[in-house]
Regions:
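Alpha-helical transmembrane segments of multi-pass membrane proteins predominantly involved
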Residues: 1-219
Length: 219
């Protein structure tokens, strides 16, 4: 595979990963959020395989395997189970409505292009075209966290944010050392478990996973 073709494929893959994050903004179903995260992680795992093959870095194959096991199989399954247990099916009243959310997300991606333009122009890596998309994914993940009321949606936003960081690290360094990615996975799993306990406590106290209910604890 020549560098030109690889550059196009890496940019296409990054575009698909970013596209799945927009599902979190234009859909209300929590099940759709989990499915979008699962497919996003699967595409990201495929990108790790592609970069590992071209860069002759077998460690990236292990990273891809971890992505498939942890983020495509284990975490989405737990999220589906959590959704059924707490009875949360829809993000009915987000802080920011859907049309406005999509506009803001588009502006965040444009901001990412503006911020990363000097880096893209200075880089000689064939993966440089996907750098703005990775930064845009991080911005969108952050926006999901702050613009949605359901704790479960915010958990998915956090996971999407971590996918953006992984994508940025892979495209920006042309690969990630296995030990670094293992450390990141451990942090993500610990954060996910803590958030799961947090959601159970919110639901047990308020019979809802709307984080706005936490305002009742004031005073």
């Amino acid at each position: 595979m020549n560098d030109a073709l690889f550059a196009q494929l890496s940019t296409l893959g990054a575009s698909l990963v970013l596209l799945f994050s927009f599902v979190l903004l234009w859909r209300r179903s929590l099940h759709a959020y989990v499915s979008a995260f699962r497919w996003q992680s699967a595409v990201l795992a495929g990108m790790f395989v592609m970069v590992g093959d071209l860069g002759s870095d077998p460690e990236l194959y292990f990273v891809a395997a971890f992505f498939l096991v942890v983020k495509v199989m284990i975490i989405p399954r737990y999220l589906d189970r959590l959704e059924k247990r707490v009875g949360a099916e829809r993000e009915s009243q987000p802080y920011v409505n859907i049309p406005t959310s999509l506009i803001i997300a588009g502006l965040l991606v444009l901001l990412a292009y503006a911020i990363t333009r000097p880096l893209v122009l200075a880089s000689a890596l064939p993966t440089r075209g996907g750098l703005p998309l990775a930064v845009g994914l991080i911005f969108v993940g952050l926006f999901v966290i702050i613009s949605r009321k359901k704790a479960l949606t915010q958990v998915v936003g956090f996971l999407v944010l971590e996918n953006g960081i992984a994508l940025l690290a892979m495209l920006g360094t042309y690969g990630i050392p296995l030990i670094v990615e293992l450390g990141v996975f451990l942090d993500v799993l610990m954060g996910f478990l803590v958030m799961q306990v947090f959601i159970y406590h919110i639901h047990g106290t308020f019979e809802s996973i709307d984080v706005e209910q936490l305002n009742q604890l004031k005073g």
